[in-house]
Structure formats: structure tokens, C-alpha cells
Amino acid sequence: FGTTETTVGRGFMGSLEQPRTVAPNLGLLRTHAGNSVDMQIHPLTRDPRGTVIGSLPKTSSSITDVGADASREHLRIWLEGEHWYAQGLGSTNGTVLESGAGDGDIVIEPPRDQREPGKVYPPVEIENSDRLHLGLYTTFLVIVD
């Protein structure tokens, strides 16, 4: 990756899009060292329960294309209004969002051994061209599907 098509942020997309009242469909593309592992796009459901990503999720809308250090139910992504959100599900190795707009990294949920006792980690909005790092070995590129 690293091409113009895959590194653009919300500023570029905003210049191409007309105002909308419906959130775009998003999908996840698994990557490895910045390159696509396979070209399979995992669509995210618009169902209010969302999509659960992990090694053994219990939901019908799930993504299991993850590395060995992803938890059974690692991350949930859902649509609320016109915005997509991600929230950690108490994973062992945590999740970090790398902003596609160049806004830096946001810790969605730190690894279990670094969490503050009793702290609730709120949902984080995700957008086209963001990257989600689940633990050390699983990265997804967020794309308009």
C-alpha cells in the first residue's frame, strides 16, 4: 500500500463526496506490514448489534480473520446514526486506531496489564482509511465498501 488511493484521509474524501444523510458502508481489509494479505474485504454490518472481531466470536456478524494474539471477542464495531464506532471488549492485547487523516494514534483499549482498574474505555469513531491494530499481529484498513 502507501499509494494515494490507500493513504488518503477524510479531507480527500470530503472533496469528492456530496453531502449525505446516510453513513457509507464500511469494510475491513486485513493487511500485513502495510500490504494486503488477501484482497478479501470483510463488510461491517449495519445491524445495531454490530460486528465482533476476534478468534472465536459468538455473533453471526463476525470477522475471524485475525492473528494468534487476538482475543476470542476482541473488538466490536457498529453504526450509530451517521457514524461508525469501535470499542474494545476486554481483550488481552488491546487495540490501537491509527488515524488515516494523520491525527495520530488513539488507544481504543490498552493491553490488559496496562489498564487502569475500574476504568471504562469509551467507543472511538472510525473512518475510511483508518487502521485498526488488534494486538501486535492483526491490522485492518478501514475502507468504504
Predicted region positions:
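Intrinsically disordered, low-complexity acidic Ser/Thr-rich regulatory segments
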Residues: 1-68, 117, 121, 125-131, ...
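Forkhead-associated
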Residues: 61-62, 74-131
